[in-house]
């Protein structure tokens, strides 16, 4: 369960980083 949660958080964090790069 913890591994799945960490994976989801990782994907969300990477997605936010990509969006910030596109905006900037």
Swiss-Prot record:
The keyword Protein biosynthesis does not apply. Keywords: Cell inner membrane, Cell membrane, Membrane, Transmembrane, Transmembrane helix. It is found in: Cell inner membrane. GO terms for cellular component: plasma membrane. Induction: Expressed in both exponential and stationary phase; expression is slightly higher in exponential phase (at protein level). It comes from the Bacteria. It is a single-pass membrane protein. The keyword Cell inner membrane applies. The chain crosses the membrane at residues 4-24. This is Protein YahV. It comes from Escherichia coli (strain K12).
